[in-house]
Amino acid sequence: MKIYTFDFDEIDIQEDFYREFIRAFDLERGSVNNLDMLWDVVTGDRLPLPLEIEFTHLPEKLRRRFGALILLFDEAEEELEGQLRFNVRQ
């Protein structure tokens, strides 16, 4: 299972995450620019499943800012039944 790591020392706002996500998965520019589009990509057939997504350098005080992203990946992990693993590390 390949691990894709997103370093929140380098990600300040949600738009930065979308840009890094597009780059990491070699998606078409502009294919993810909001949570709905991200959900469609993650739960659709556009990612090389199975995979693990890891958020690093995301302390508790920043988790509120990125709470919607965390919730989306938590829900996608359930939806994809073992094909996606998601972890958050400080």
Residue ranges, per PLM feature:
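N-terminal intrinsically disordered, low-complexity segments enriched in P/E/S/T
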Residues: 1-30, 43-90
